[in-house]
Curated annotation (Swiss-Prot):
Belongs to the venom Kunitz-type family. GO terms for cellular component: extracellular region. GO terms for molecular function: serine-type endopeptidase inhibitor activity; toxin activity. Keywords: Disulfide bond, Protease inhibitor, Secreted, Serine protease inhibitor, Toxin. The keyword Secreted applies. This is Kunitz-type serine protease inhibitor OMI. It is found in: Secreted. It comes from the Eukaryota.
Length: 17
């Protein structure tokens, strides 16, 4: 799951690309 676009970011955003 990518949380880079979801504020707030839980520390280092994990982008599941």
């Amino acid at each position: 799951k990518d949380f880079c676009h979801l504020p707030p970011k839980p520390g280092p955003c994990r982008a599941a690309i």
